[in-house]
């Protein structure tokens, strides 16, 4: 694990990703391969967050480019059928939290923060598709 280096948002994002990974591991395997792909993406995002913290620790005086305020979270991201897939639903909650923390993190961390955000978006899409598949929507 990377040094803290005053990176509370990155640390919080990593913790949320770890919880998402655990929820996906608990989920049943009948998701048409989407669960497995989501696990891969979550683990890649965890690696990117860790690398971002390492980058920040190695470049403590680097400010990076100016960033505007974080993009607002979507108000309604209803996932139809999630109530029938509680572990997958929990993974979505944790992925949204990781995304929120990363959006609020300062600076770009050598590009790793943006990379992690992209991976999280892909993971959310895979989890949604896994829920749809498991609920009969092939």
Predicted regions, residues:
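Long, charged/polar, soluble alpha-helical segments
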Residues: 2-138
